[in-house]
Amino acid sequence: QMCIRDRTYVGPVVYSGFERVNVKKTDVPQVLGEDADITRYTSQTDTGINAIDPCVKTDDNGDMWMTFGSWFGGMWMFKLDPTTGLRDYNSTYPTEANKSDAYYGVKLGGGFGNSGEGSYLLHDNGYWYLFASYGALQQTGGYQIRMFRSKDITGPYADEAGNTAISTKAIGNNWQSDIGERLMSSIQWSGNDLSLIHI
């Protein structure tokens, strides 16, 4: 085991981008079963999920959760085992369109090629707040932070108008929509083609 400061590396928590030839090197067979059909997980046109941008939180019951993903594949979460910091293999999730997935867990937001990444959860006054970055990280990409809230850590998350954080279809430039409470945005000042300022 490799020690990183006061942390100890134990192993990967979730995988993405694997193929049929290397899936045995992941924990997918352990989660789904040795003979599970993994076709949807090896197709970028199906799930398109990236295992990036983790955020770990503990709920009021003492359960530990991790959110992650994904820009175009949606933001997801599943329960962790607090003794190992890895996935809680005793927790299972049904595969239901736009709600949950047997491997990736509970869907929190985004999906269908719409931007949405960097999920972060904050608990305050009885609500869980989901913060997510929309847009593209470039001068004209409209990179910004949107916020949704829920009474339950697993959602559903919605904005003040009742719009859900979960995308059920491709929207296009969803960062130009009015879904989610916009907190911060990128701007482009005329006469300055090289800067990006977040306000």
State each model region's role.
Residues 1, 5-197:
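Carbohydrate-active catalytic/glycan-binding domains of CAZyme proteins
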